[in-house]
């Protein structure tokens, strides 16, 4: 009898499906974004977009019957990309391989080569440079490339009669890239950059730089400092500057912090959130959708769709499927080009009475 019981126990242990290598009952989505520094508003919006997408996917049964769950790591990347690598490794130690993020260019540059060599898929909802996704076939950019919008604004400035421009772009990599793009396109058209200022990304006093820039008597100013644009607007106003101001990206929170000093500022950006996403977000969080919320939502839906349609969960298989997805998302129709960058329409915006309003479709 004892021999029989031992035999039965042996059979049960080794015949039980997935006994020691059970398929996880949930699929973990890791989020890498800033939630405790100057980019916390964008980071919070990103996390909330992911939460709404996870709720939607789980509400319709999950992926192959498995529910999605969320893990968030704070990248604190407003001034440095180094923390993003630490956050990434923390998620990887917990075997998370489906990742949304990081938030900005510095982290993207630091993280892309590491992720490209790893068994993960990374989709950023807020990075606006092409260098990120070009690092590997498993890296995706659902935001688009901001350079196109910046170059468009340079053409619009020249068309409006600007021939002399002052450029202020911080040393944060994304800010710097936009300043370079604007200056390059403006000079290509025949304009002259009469002043170029490059403050530190965490600077708060811009008066000396602004006085120096205004002394060159520019026809207009191009401002690229995502985390301090509101401060710059206030200081320009105190100096009596009333001329035109162009930028490439303004966040509603930054505009609000500027206390009206950014009124009249024009910029080009991708189309914002639309449809039922706006009402659902407002009903859930009692605030308007912020930068990154809609694209984070779309990133999760794109990943869930790719997972659902893939024959297995190998990174190569899912990456290939993800590159072909197409659906109507919160930020518009989601499709990727051959470099795994979302194809998105650029629109022109203006700040009026402390609020961002759509001006007209861009080219």
What are these regions (language model features)?
Residues 4-10, 16-363:
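Extracytosolic ligand-binding ectodomains
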């Amino acid at each position: 009898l004892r021999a029989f019981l031992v035999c039965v126990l042996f059979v049960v242990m080794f015949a039980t499906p997935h006994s020691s290598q059970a398929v996880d009952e949930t699929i973990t989505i890791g989020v890498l974004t800033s939630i405790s520094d100057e980019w916390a508003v964008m980071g919070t919006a990103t996390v909330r977009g992911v939460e709404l997408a996870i709720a939607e996917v789980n509400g319709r049964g999950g992926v192959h019957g498995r529910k999605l769950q969320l893990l968030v790591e704070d990248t604190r990347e407003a001034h440095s990309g180094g923390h993003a690598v630490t956050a990434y490794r923390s998620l990887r130690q917990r075997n998370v391989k489906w990742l949304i993020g990081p938030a900005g260019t510095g982290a993207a540059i630091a993280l892309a080569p590491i992720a490209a060599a790893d068994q993960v898929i990374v989709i950023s909802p807020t990075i606006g440079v092409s260098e990120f996704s070009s690092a590997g076939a498993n890296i995706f950019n659902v935001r688009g490339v901001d350079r196109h919008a910046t170059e468009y604004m340079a053409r619009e400035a020249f068309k409006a009669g600007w021939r002399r421009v002052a450029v202020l772009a911080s040393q944060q990599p994304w800010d710097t890239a936009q300043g370079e793009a604007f200056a390059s396109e403006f000079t290509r058209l025949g304009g002259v950059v009469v002043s170029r200022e490059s403050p530190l990304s965490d600077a708060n006093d811009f008066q000396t730089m602004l006085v120096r820039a205004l002394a060159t008597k520019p026809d207009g100013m191009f401002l690229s400092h995502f985390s301090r644009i509101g401060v710059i607007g206030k200081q320009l106003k105190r100096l009596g500057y009333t001329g035109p101001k162009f930028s490439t990206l303004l966040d509603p929170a930054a505009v609000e912090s500027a206390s009206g000093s950014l009124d009249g500022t024009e910029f080009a950006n991708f189309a914002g959130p639309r449809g039922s996403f706006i009402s659902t977000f407002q009903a859930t969080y009692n605030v308007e959708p912020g930068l990154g919320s809609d694209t984070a939502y779309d990133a999760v839906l794109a990943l869930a769709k790719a997972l659902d349609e893939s024959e297995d969960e190998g990174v190569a298989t899912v990456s290939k499927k993800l590159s072909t997805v197409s659906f109507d998302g919160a930020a518009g129709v989601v499709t990727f080009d051959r470099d795994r960058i979302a194809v998105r329409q650029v629109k022109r915006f203006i700040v009026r009475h402390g609020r961002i309003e759509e001006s007209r479709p861009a080219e």
